[in-house]
Amino acid sequence: IPVEDASTTINFPEDGTYYVYARTYNWTSPWSKAKGPGRFILKIDNKRLMPVLGDEGEQWQWQSAGKVSVKAGKSILSLHDLTGFNGRCDAIYMTTDMGKLPPEPKEELEAFRRNMLDLPFEPIESSEYDLVVVGGGIAGICAATAAARLGCKVALVNDRPVLGGNNSSEIRVHLGGTIEVGPNKGLGRMIREFGHSIEGNAQSAENYEDEKKSKMIADEENITLFANCRAIKVEMKGEKIDAVVIKHIETGEEQILSAPLFSDCTGDGTIGYLAGADYRMGREARAEYGEDLAPEKADKMTMGASVQWYSVETSKKSCFPRFNYGI
């Protein structure tokens, strides 16, 4: 089933020819020189701009999407993904000055973006909390709720509009872990309060019952949910985290959340990494912890990535896009 276009209404201040640029990334470029799978195009008032974007280059970059002649007033800008959820687009920039691009260096681009969006140059200081939980997946939901029920004032930061992480309707990995085993018989019991009742990966969105997770958090008076917000940096006092800076993924607004304790539930160890904590990727050698299933020598192998899908009957034929992941 084709992915619906991502669309928004924009207001052109004057008639004219506008040169259009998209900031994109060919995300398979670190391991492949071939054209990437993240191909997309732009449309203005349903008129296609011809260049295909997102499938070349080796870093985030501004790509020309061509030019368009428009009348002053409102228009619909649409991003049409050619392969389904594979495109990468950070920003779209339009100008009547041919060849005038935003800056590329990170600091200069950040200042340019703040100026264009009329954002303050310093993050907003938010309330202090007893605990800041970063990541609104299953681990984050449980950590925030457990602390809140013990009387802690909790901030829960989630970079998506829905809770659940991999178990949300956006990713659709079911809850299949074994719980309540070993010496801690109650461990994992909280999942019963919001877990979905239908098993299976990559099923219909409603199977994952996002509303249960939302209600779970909304019902806890001690939890403040920061939805659509991503932690982008940490502030340190010595070797301890003093605060995290979060950015709203739609508005670009930033806030500072302070607390004596932080729980990294990002799934990628993001907060620990930003704080300079030691980390490793891969599998440790068998001799290090005496695990029978560990390799004899340490290696870089990590969990694989699955391309999951399901099928539905429709009234017309559809095709599966052909593309190359470069592996």
PLM features: residue spans?
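Rossmann-like dinucleotide-binding core of oxidoreductases
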Residues: 271-327
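Conserved beta-strand-loop-beta-strand element in the redox core of flavoprotein oxidoreductases
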Residues: 235-256
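Beta1/beta-strand and adjacent pyrophosphate-binding region of the FAD-binding site
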Residues: 125-137
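Conserved N-terminal/central alpha/beta ligand/cofactor-binding core
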Residues: 146, 152-153, 158-240, 280, ...
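Glycine-/small-residue-rich beta->alpha transition segments that form the dinucleotide
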Residues: 261, 265-270
